[in-house]
Amino acid sequence: MSKNNPQAFLRDVADIIDERGKTHGHWRENMEVTAKMWSLFLGHYLSRPITAEQAAVMMGLLKVSRMACRSVTEEHCEDFVGYGGLAGGLLRVKNQESLET
């Protein structure tokens, strides 16, 4: 099967998320800590804290801004898609937890 298709690209991104988990920690905990740090830093500007899924989306936006200022690279695209996957995963966890309560 060709590796030059969207499905192969997404499988590669899933592998990257797994690999980075070994060095950066679990994706859910990482985004929760990031959200808390951003909420503390932005404190008086915000009316409510940033959620973990919002932090993941904002990390994706960071990748978009890098692509807008420089060039689009495969790595930036992988990271952008990966952060979207983290946001989606966080929302699934949140939705499941709300169903259980």
Language model feature labels by segment:
Residues 1-101:
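Intrinsically disordered, low-complexity regulatory regions
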